Amino acid sequence: MKQTLYEKLDELAKSDIYPFHMPGHKRQLQDRQFGDTLKIDITEISSFDDLHEPEGILKEEQEFAAGLYGADHTYYIVNGSTCGILTAVSAVCRWGDTIVMARNCHKSVYHAAYLQNLQIEYIEPQRYKEGYPVGPVFTKEIEHALQRAEQKQAAKAVILTSPTYEGVLSDIPAIAEIVHAHHAVLIVDEAHGAHLGFSTEFPQSAVRQGADLIVQSLHKTLPAMTQTALLHICGDRVDMQRVQYYLDIYETSSPSYVMMASMSKCLHLIGEEKDSLFSAFDEKLQDFYEIREQLKHITILDEVWAWNTYHAYMDPSKINICVAGCMRNGSIYTGKMLSAELLEKYHIETEMTAEQYVIAMTSVMDTQEGFDRLKAALREIDSKLSVIESRKSTITRSGYMGTELPPRRISDEEENTDFDCKTEKNVKNNAGRSAGQNSMLNVEEEEAEHRADSMQTAYTIREAMDHKQKAVDWRDAIGRVSAEFVIVYPPGAPLLVPGEVITQELNEKVRHYQKVGLNLQGVQDRTLQRICIVTE
């Protein structure tokens, strides 16, 4: 071993690489929090309570968290939102129940479905175009999924991700109304939204929008240590005893007091200074987004883009930097190239790399110097790019808040053809349709594409994974039932789920993602030459 983990971390801390990625503390906590963490790394000693049976200080801390967010009950979680997801699904769904699930859910949701042998009724999030951020889940799709489930076995829960990794939000108030009308529980994976609801400049949290169980990762977007998360209960549709029962199963019996202290410090900081923190954060974001008028080729997929494309709201703290249609020296310029150049030349590490865009993840702890470095880097990179002729941009004047988005809709079914939104960039794709237009106008076309892309399910996830199986070459697996996941990570959403029939179209997509350098997980053979299938 050339370096220990500590030596490597210490080396990184002393470098000038700027962290446009989680965790949210952004290495800025030295003066705000504690220095020598080992001094507070204790176990359940006298007067320090027990997270699994809180009666003292930890009970008080969780009650403070509930009050801060507006939940009825809140639980500390020290092994990530994954634990919260497993707990939420298991508490609501019993063995063999049906759950309505958004296809872009995190892999932990699929693992929960495996553990409870759940029947899954999928709903497809809206998609503008391959390679762009996935959109919201529409209420109509949820209504149809619940109705389909009722023909066989009524769904006990609906689970979806909002905001998405890229920051796109679904219409939680309208969705909650529909879910509750079908006597189901709404679970929202809000892992990327722990910072929501503390400022009018940011979208509201699902905690205050009618969801029943909400899971948040504190560490992703707020100043807290990695793995720290919260599970909120709102209303009386969920059995608290079952929630506590499954928390006792999934959460470690040795919770870290260092992590819990980090959570406490984070939440009290937000409670005391949220106005000043989020005001300063918003000013930095507004200043950053002015770069949109200066970029000729790179496009920032912001909240105006999300509204025009999906009629959905977007979290401005997620900076989506899109290079679709960009070229350099006669060759296509990809998201992978952008992220590599930002790191190698400008010492900026981004959160996620997709085929045509990268995500720079921000928080209240980001510095003006960090934003300025990113702006300078993007301006310089943009000056060296050109665009494919069919994707030339039209620039119009509009500041970050220059286009006033209307108040949150009651329902996403509301007619939107009268909404006239000026965007800074109307990015035209190869077909000539503008990303600035509402791409959901041709709903029948979109639904047909979703049906064509849908996978045929032969077994539940548990049946497939526990079945007799063997590894075969991918070309021999076409038409057979998969016993493995194929997951694009990050963000962690599966392309293929155990129990689904492997298609040639899927094989081609996997090869394409592999070619462009995306990280694919879930299969034993990391070279993706072979895959495990169910055998009779």
List where the protein language model places each region:
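Conserved PLP-enzyme active-site core in the AAT-like
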Residues: 2-10, 31-34, 41, 53, ...
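Conserved N-terminal alpha-helix of the aminotransferase class I/II PLP-enzyme fold
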Residues: 38-80
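Structural signal for conserved beta-strand scaffold positions within catalytic alpha/beta enzyme cores
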Residues: 76, 122-124, 216, 352, ...
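Conserved C-terminal alpha-helix-loop-beta "cap" of PLP-dependent enzymes
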Residues: 290-395, 441-501, 508-522
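Intrinsically disordered, low-complexity terminal tails and inter-domain linkers enriched
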Residues: 387-452
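Terminal helix/beta-alpha structural elements that buttress the NAD(P)+-binding lobe
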Residues: 524-536
